[in-house]
Amino acid sequence: MMQFQRDLEASLEAVSANAQELLKSLKSRKDVQDLNASLPKDPLDNCDAQTQAARAQLAEAATRILRLSIRPQEYLEHLQNGYQHLTCFRWLVELNILDHLPHSGTISYTDLARKASVPPMQLRSICRMAICNGFLEEPEANQVRHSRISALFARDESYLGWARWMVNYSVPAAYKLSDATRSWGETVAKDQTAFNLGMDVKVPFFDHLRQTPAMKDAFAAYMRNVTSNATWGLQHAVTGFDWASLPRGAKVVDVGGSLGHGSIAIAKEHTHLTFVIQDLPETVAGARKEMAQNDKIEASVKSRITFQEHDFFGPQTVKDADVYFLRMICHDWPDNEAKVILSQIRAALKPGAQIVIMDTILPQPGTTSVLQEQQLRIRDLTMMEVFNAKERELEDWSSLMQSAGLEISRVNQPLNSVMGLLTVRSAGQTALSGTNTLTPELVTAVSASTGSADSRPVLIAGAGIAGLCLAQALKKAGIDFRVFERDSHIDARPQGYRLKFEADAAQSLKNILPDDVYEAFELSNAVTAVGETDFNPFNGNIIHSRTGGGLSGKKGLYATFTVDRKAFRTQLMTGIEDKISFGKEIAYYKTDDSASTVTAEFKDGTHVTGSFLAGTDGLHSVVRKTCVPDHRIVDTGAACIYGKTVMTPEFLARFPEKGLRFMTVVSDIAPMLQSCLIGDSPVTLLLEPIRFSEASRARYPELPADYVYWALIGPKERFGSQEVTSMKNFVSLDQAAEQAAKLSLAVTEEWHPSLRALFELQDTKQASLIRVASTIPDIPSWESHSNVTVLGDSIHPMSPCGGVGANTAIVDADALAKVLVEHGTKPPVNAIAEFEAAMRTRAKRNIWRSEVGSKRMFGQKNLVDCSEFVF
């Protein structure tokens, strides 16, 4: 019951979040309506990647809600809908009904039946069944028109070709699977398949295809759609392997390459490569003719492609190739025949040559999205029904390679693709290593095959500073890991701009980062200037100013590094990009003490199992709420607006020059009577110029223009309690940023114009308003666990007034990494307890420092007296 409730809640949250993201995108689009367009268009066409990701996650969550809400007694009813919908779809396609449906406007059932020469009553019943499933529309009684779905088939002949192939060949074969099993049992014979029974033929699929021109044409139309479809598309072949690393003139053999679509796509992007496309004689003849007649293929591409007649079951005749490319080849054949194909290539491999296989890699059940897994299972069953073959899990691929004297050196599963890419070499040349772009799903598959918790990755919840630092430390130590971030991408929301690191964090970064990443980090930092200037907000005069002094002394703040947050996070992702999954929010986790594993369940319905879970998922940490359920987070009573103002000539002319040397503070203290009688507390502005050296810009031209980082902090009543509360209700982040920017102007409306320039010229899209939360300095201990812990803001959030939140998180990550390096990814519980105790001591010191700063800057009361933070 609890599992059901958790799954339902997670799916509902995913629907809400992604529906809002989708609506925000649709409302912001300024598509010009094409008045000459006739067929309805899909409003989701041409959306950006972020919107498409939200759409996919919405569809996934809706699918899960449907599964959860349907009662067992209704299952057969939904199957009935499925087969009747398919029946109606076939009727509409085979009787060419869409040819007679107008591209714009409606048509009566009577007129449509007359045009198509079909019985009117049948037409109406069949159309209305299709309408129930979104195919066609009936906007008024007895008037039918295209829907956005049916319009695709009227607009794109390749989809209609796929439809004809599905209803005439795929469906009959699928329906006869049980009969084939009853007749032949377990067999790999190509003429004893469900396809043979469904089509009533005696020969294997490809033999029948060659003998049947109509079927051959239908199959070609189907394959054209496959190559153009994004989930099956050739772009993944282009980007999924490092073709650029091959030497100039390198030879690629496209084994079983058919018409050469794969080679052509790669050749267009990589002009230094040559290609040999191999296939059977009749296929090669057709391919040569088609390429010669295709004016869309440039001569420079054609000149680097040759065709060769070849049967891949025979000896490989090209022995000087650098890469042998097999796309959708092995899945057509059972293991014994696939082994022959691979062995023939293995015998021809020159030293250093590779095999690139683009084919389906089946996930373990439940480790990828429902919709993705459905498509992969469809492919698996299709191979079984047509060829007595199968799609393979990673373990199956590994075993197949081993049988042919090969081994997998790299695995890449592109997002939104039904096929992965396997890079293969002769056995003994390499081993599957940490450089692979293995997705969490494939990691789960590997782990399941070995059964060893030690082989499972460390799971890191959150790609903030603590999470990425821990990831880099684990990479440096050779410990496998995966990072899961709830945001859809790294810049999904403003998170502040400037960070200052002191000596302890600087040392931890040196411990954590590989040498090349640390060197890049140092060079990408902003110029650090030590000092402070204080201004009167009302007349714009300097009150206090000191260069160095206390800030550079032993008792003051001594910043080792001044860091642009975005540049820093980018550096922290260097070399581990393939280990980070965005748009993955943990719903809950569960531990298995007997297996020493922990499984994270995500709100999109997927899950992944690891050896250890580190909660670095911030203030709203799901890991903390489970691991330390009674942990106290308090509301400091403050709100803070973070902002960024670029140092344009106009800004430099208006803002006080001496306010742009180092740290500047402006304190807006309440008037006397308000302070005495009402208890009005101050509002404080902290700002600092962020400038980059010429050397940094020469090395990293993508660094932002010089800017001023600022934070305006004060009691939330000064910002308007209602405004602070309502910010989280904005659908659009742009709306929230704009409102925060307006609020900064309202709070400082009586300030001197020279200082107000900071807010008037700010980048309004970069402003963000947050409520300031903290934990108390004396953090109570909790029961430790051997395979789960929390660190950073997940467990000890603190006010920004101390300037040490990020410092503390970095040192936490360094300390936890040392535990995992020393004890492995199944550390004893006492080792985790010692880490957590030291973390609490470290946090206490820094929370106290933040508390002191908060009292001065906005009149915060003692943290122990603050009320609970309401999320």
Swiss-Prot record:
Region of interest called FAD-dependent monooxygenase, as start-end residue ranges on this chain: 430-871
Active-site residues, record numbering mapped to chain: H331
Keyword Flavoprotein assigned: yes
Protein name from the UniProt record: Dual O-methyltransferase/FAD-dependent monooxygenase CTB3
GO biological process: methylation; secondary metabolite biosynthetic process
Domain of life: Eukaryota
Keyword annotations of the record: FAD, Flavoprotein, Methyltransferase, Monooxygenase, Multifunctional enzyme, NAD, Oxidoreductase, S-adenosyl-L-methionine, Transferase
O-methyltransferase: region residues: 1-429
Amino acids binding S-adenosyl-L-methionine: D279
GO molecular function: FAD binding; monooxygenase activity; O-methyltransferase activity
Enzymatic reactions: nor-toralactone + S-adenosyl-L-methionine = toralactone + S-adenosyl-L-homocysteine + H(+); toralactone + NADH + O2 + H(+) = 1-(3,4,5-trihydroxy-7-methoxynaphthalen-2-yl)propan-2-one + CO2 + NAD(+)
EC number assigned by the record: 2.1.1.-, 1.-.-.-
Recorded metabolic or biological pathway in which this protein acts: Mycotoxin biosynthesis
Family statement drawn from the similarity comment of this UniProt entry: In the C-terminal section; belongs to the paxM FAD-dependent monooxygenase family.
Function per UniProt: Dual O-methyltransferase/FAD-dependent monooxygenase; part of the gene cluster that mediates the biosynthesis of cercosporin, a light-activated, non-host-selective toxin. The perylenequinone chromophore of cercosporin absorbs light energy to attain an electronically-activated triplet state and produces active oxygen species such as the hydroxyl radical, superoxide, hydrogen peroxide or singlet oxygen upon reaction with oxygen molecules. These reactive oxygen species cause damage to various cellular components including lipids, proteins and nucleic acids.
Residues bound to FAD: E485, R569, D793, A806
Family annotation (PROSITE patterns): SAM_OMT_II (PS51683)
One Pfam family of this chain: NAD_binding_8
